[in-house]
């Protein structure tokens, strides 16, 4: 396989693994999953996208990004278990692609390819796409910020600004 297709292969493998798993059981039976999904549903139904609530009580234990993404998926696809898992699954796919990019930059396309595939086939990452825990999204944003800042340090001035902006945007 020509090395120019490595990034595409990593994305396709990650999509098959992570998007394929969102439609299969189990449903949102765990307490944590149900709470996260219900908070997003409450946001959608109430129209209050600023303050997460559970049973009318303000729920500020977690950052709202995950709830916003789940609520947007509910808006687009309806309120379903699989729709609640889409943001985490897409976050995992993006994390695999970003790992590929990081490896390409740091070493070579082949190294990036193996790094992206290794992450895509990692059991731990797969398990985290099955539950609604924000760890994958946090890992994605931290990795993107580190990648952006690393690229900013070694780039030309114009490129450095763009990479630094990526790093800053990923940090929130």
Segments the model singles out, each with a brief description of its role:
Residues 1-172:
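Membrane-integral, polyisoprenol-dependent glycosyltransferases
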